[in-house]
A protein has these predicted regions:
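Aromatic-lined, polymer-binding surfaces characteristic
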Residues: 105-114
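Short, conserved phosphate-binding/catalytic loop or strand-edge motifs used
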Residues: 60-68
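Conserved, well-structured interaction surfaces
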Residues: 1-54, 70-106, 253-255, 260-261, ...
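Short amphipathic alpha-helical coiled-coil/interface segments
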Residues: 39, 43, 118, 151-155
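An aromatic- and glycine-enriched ligand-binding surface/loop that stacks and positions planar moieties
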Residues: 1, 57, 61, 91-93, ...
Length: 327
């Protein structure tokens, strides 16, 4: 399959690095070793990519070109639990080589990213083995207790590394409590947000750009279909006090009241009245979004968020994404 090919092509690229890495120990500076740690990180990443899609797989732990014969390529798969442990071992090696986030402000793979990745792998495989025991998809040996224990151990290590959540108290640009959450997704520079351990910096001047904000503002995510957040997603957000909502309550028939007293992350994620709709186009002089009940009197000022457009530029639900647009 395409995913199988993608995973192993990327693993070959990483192992090509290991095959031709010839730096003498005396010249292995901390910067050189950190780059070596990045290779271990990505070898773990692509094995995890394959594990989550296929389960037990052949482990590509070396450069295979010397075995590029019909017989040499018949590498038997390892049990999924052994694959997971191989991934965790690579991430542990990466952790010991990588710089901390502070060195490059999150612009390169860092020690903290390796720990978080290891937690994700251990949690994924641990829960898989726990809940698939006795099925055709079970690991040969149930190691869920050990894997889930590793999550706790790694978490304790991560908590001592000085990362901090981006909150209204720490974010000088946050006016409302939800702003700090939104800024994680719509800020141009995440250097000082230590909660973001690995990110990519975009710059028009440097030619590093993307179209996501423009696409989302126009009502679509990609060219394959219309956008629109689902009702069930909106219903899953709690009230600000942590209690769940009852979607059957009459208050939620009113679009504006739907957002009253709700978790700030809902307000940061979904367009509602007073948001700057499609603010990614400065020349349009966008006004704040206004949602009112339709009538003949106000039909000129109330515009639905692309409900009636055609093709992919259409919102299929009426819940238009705000995250990464209203900046």
């Amino acid at each position: 399959t395409t995913e199988w090919q993608k995973g192993y092509q990327n693993l070959r690229n990483v192992n090509y690095f290991f095959e031709y890495y010839k730096v003498p120990e005396t010249e292995e500076t901390k910067d050189v070793l950190s780059m070596k740690g990045e290779a271990y990180f990505f070898r773990a990443y692509w094995h995890f990519y394959l594990l989550t899609r296929f389960g037990s797989i052949p482990v590509m732990d070396r450069f295979w070109d010397g075995n590029a014969t019909v017989g040499g390529l018949q590498i038997p798969p390892r049990d999924r639990s052994a694959v997971a442990q191989f991934i965790l071992d690579d991430l542990n090696t990466a952790k010991g080589l990588l710089h901390s986030r502070s060195q490059y402000k999150g612009l390169r793979v860092c020690k903290e990213a390796a720990i978080i990745m290891a937690m994700r792998v251990a949690l994924y495989e641990g829960t898989w083995e726990k809940y698939h025991k006795g099925t055709d998809f079970a690991a040969a040996e149930d190691k869920s207790a050990d894997l889930l224990g590793q999550v706790l151990t790694l978490g304790d290590e991560l908590f001592g590394m000085g990362l901090a959540l981006n909150t209204k108290a720490t974010d000088k640009n946050a006016v409302n409590i939800e702003d700090a959450y939104a800024h994680i997704f719509n800020s141009k520079d995440l250097s000082d947000m230590t909660e973001v351990v690995f990110w990519k910096k975009y710059s028009i001047a440097d030619g590093v750009i993307h179209n996501l904000s423009s696409n989302l503002g126009a009502g679509y995510v990609d060219n394959s279909g219309p956008a629109g957040l689902s009702q069930s997603l909106v219903d899953n957000y709690l009230n600000a006090d942590g209690t769940p909502i009852n979607p059957a309550d009459g208050i939620f028939k009113d679009f504006n009241l739907t957002f009253k007293g709700r978790d700030g992350r809902l307000l940061a994620t979904v367009m509602h009245s007073n948001c700057k709709f499609k603010s990614t186009s400065p020349e349009s002089k966008s006004k704040a979004m206004l949602v009112e009940e339709y009538s003949e009197e106000n039909k000129q000022i109330v515009r639905p968020p692309y409900l009636t457009e055609g093709g992919p530029a259409r919102n299929a639900t009426g819940y238009h994404i705000r995250m990464s647009i209203d900046t």
